[in-house]
Amino acid sequence: RRSSQIDDIERGLPAELRGAEIAYAERTFRSHRHRLVARLDRAYRTSAGVQLVELKTRPRDAVYMSDVIELSTQRIALQDETGETVSDEAWVVVQNSRSGSRRPSKVRLLGLSEIAAMRERYVAVVHGRVTRPAPARTPSQCDHCAHKTRCGAKYQDRA
């Protein structure tokens, strides 16, 4: 039974992470210094440090910028809370919701300055300090956003 659980966890992982120790799973980390909170799916301990893995289930085998932002925030929060070295590359493992197949994609994470700038922009928009915020490129990007109702009043296609 244990062997089948390990096989399922490792299914879809890149070869370099198969057999690696799971350092953290489904855990929340905080960076008080940068005022960030992130819940990571998995982090593996390797000889090069900790490597992040984000698991996604989607009908399309696609990696989005939001995945990179999420993993980049996880990296900052994990490093700040634990002091461990976290790789500036991570993996997004997409499980196809139709076929169940999994495919890993390596991504390069954003730096602290880029994430800090995004956080500052978010805070400015939420507090009304940005007079002309731009809507998301497509309405589907708004589907799960906490601010959808507020934006829907301004951008009629977001409601």
Where do the language-model regions lie?
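Acidic-basic catalytic patches of nuclease active cores, encompassing PD-(D/E)XK
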Residues: 1-26
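Short, polar/flexible loop-turn hinges at active-site or ligand-entry regions and domain interfaces
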Residues: 61-62, 133
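Conserved catalytic cores of phosphodiester-cleaving nucleases, focusing on short active-site segments
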Residues: 36-61, 71-76
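Short alpha-helix boundary/capping segments
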Residues: 62-69, 110
